[in-house]
């Protein structure tokens, strides 16, 4: 019933109009599992390799026909005839087939597409939701959404250095209420921007992307929008930042160049900057506040801010257990951002989450800036009781698909579902 009978990959488009890979896994019972792989704009240097064709005459070199070929010609023959319920074994076979530490041979996009589609086919065959298949009977916690309502950095074409300004509806009682609160703030933010004569075009993840005089002005405008929506900053709503500092770090000079503000800072000065913002605004989480290789700077930031706010490693850890292990040993950061395509298989993703939780780190399940209608990350967030999800603004179908899936999951869980709000920050003083 759960034996794989066929595997097929094709090239499709993501939300930025770039090619990505879709994989279909068919079982002997006729069941189909289908998955589409996302793609990032600000990518960590230590991420698994996303295989692109490089043929400038086709999709400006961004085609993925080679990855598609690797699935159809190399991976498919090896896993056809295997049981889709053997997720760990199938993922291991693909890792062995690739044989490189960063999936450079077959491509993380090829491997992940198959890994996700196998899991979906298995869940479908058992007639249970994906979150329940991956997480078992204890998968019950709906995540607090980190809603990216204002964009800068490489996710937008403006002069704001910080990549994402997010609201977290920690005061909600249910996920449904949290989504409503965040959405109302988003619409009020549009009105606030209009009233100031600022642009209301959106970035890759659906957040607004106006030109502002400073990074702090973005926070001030969001505070206005929260109050205009009738909510109390710091009580109903907390703020989160994704700085993506690697994007403006000068490796040679060891300096952070915030070109939007026309200033240059050392790691210590960046931490001073964050400390001042945290004192002034209800910021509960800062992601990638320093460069992915500035381990000493990260240690200082964790030492100074880690008791009071969530310090999230994205480019720092790239969902990789080896880099996470180093972070745990050196007391660097206190939270990990989890992106499936940074590491490339369901199994390795779950391993990273387990390692983080055992060390007392919080986990944030995340989308990529180049997304699709695939909502797998919504199921994974509930499967592992992550407590937090980052999947953009309540706009653009590629983002809303994940929120709508979480609404469905909340309905499926009924009274057993939990939304714990502020309690997701279990390792800091709230």
From Swiss-Prot:
Pathway: Carbohydrate degradation; glycolysis; pyruvate from D-glyceraldehyde 3-phosphate: step 4/5. One of its GO terms (molecular function) is phosphopyruvate hydratase activity. The keyword Metal-binding applies. One of its GO terms (cellular component) is cell surface. (2R)-2-phosphoglycerate binds at residues 163, 339, 368-369, 390. Pfam families: Enolase_C (PF00113), Enolase_N (PF03952). It is found in: Cytoplasm; Secreted; Cell surface. Its EC number is 4.2.1.11. Catalyzes the reversible conversion of 2-phosphoglycerate (2-PG) into phosphoenolpyruvate (PEP). It is essential for the degradation of carbohydrates via glycolysis. This is Enolase. It comes from Alkaliphilus metalliredigens (strain QYMF). The lineage of its organism: Bacteria, Bacillati, Bacillota, Clostridia, Peptostreptococcales. The gene is eno.
């Amino acid at each position: 019933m759960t034996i794989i009978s066929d595997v097929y990959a094709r090239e499709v488009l993501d939300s930025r109009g770039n090619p990505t890979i879709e994989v279909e896994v068919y079982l002997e019972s006729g069941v189909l599992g289908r998955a589409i792989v996302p793609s990032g704009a600000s990518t960590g240097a230590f991420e698994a390799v996303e295989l692109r064709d490089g043929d400038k005459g086709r999709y400006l070199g961004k085609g993925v026909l080679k990855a598609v070929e690797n699935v159809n010609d190399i991976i498919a023959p090896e896993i056809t005839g295997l049981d889709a319920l053997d997720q760990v074994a199938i993922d291991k076979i693909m890792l062995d087939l690739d044989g490189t530490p960063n999936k450079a041979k077959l491509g993380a996009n090829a491997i992940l597409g198959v890994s996700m589609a196998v899991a979906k086919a298995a869940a479908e065959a058992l007639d249970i939701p994906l979150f329940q298949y991956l997480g078992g009977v204890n998968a019950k916690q709906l995540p607090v959404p980190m809603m990216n309502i204002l964009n800068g950095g490489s996710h937008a074409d403006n002069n704001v250095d910080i990549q994402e300004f997010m609201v977290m509806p920690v005061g909600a009682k249910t996920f449904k209420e949290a989504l409503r609160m965040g959405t109302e703030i988003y619409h009020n933010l549009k009105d606030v921007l209009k009233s100031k004569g600022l642009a209301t075009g959106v970035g890759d993840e659906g957040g607004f992307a106006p030109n502002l005089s400073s990074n702090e002005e973005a926070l001030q405008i969001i505070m206005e929008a929260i109050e205009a929506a009738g909510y109390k900053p710091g009580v109903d709503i907390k703020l989160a930042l994704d700085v993506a500092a690697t994007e403006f770090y000068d490796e040679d000079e060891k300096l952070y160049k915030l070109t939007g503000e026309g200033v240059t800072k050392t790691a210590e000065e960046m931490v001073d900057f964050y400390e001042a913002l945290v004192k002034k605004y209800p910021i509960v989480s800062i992601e990638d506040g320093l460069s992915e290789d500035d381990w000493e700077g990260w240690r200082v930031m964790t030492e100074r801010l880690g008791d009071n706010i969530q310090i999230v490693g994205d480019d720092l850890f790239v969902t990789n257990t080896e880099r996470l292990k180093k972070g745990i040993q050196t007391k660097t950061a206190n939270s990990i951002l989890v992106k499936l395509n940074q590491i490339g298989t369901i199994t390795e993703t779950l391993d990273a989450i387990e390692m983080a939780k055992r060390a007392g780190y919080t986990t944030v399940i995340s989308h990529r800036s180049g997304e699709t209608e695939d909502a797998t990350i919504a199921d994974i967030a509930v499967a592992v009781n992550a407590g937090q999800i980052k999947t953009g603004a309540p706009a653009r179908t590629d983002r809303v698909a994940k929120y709508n899936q979480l609404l469905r999951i909340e309905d499926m869980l009924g009274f057993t579902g939990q939304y714990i709000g502020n309690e997701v920050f279990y390792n800091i003083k709230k």
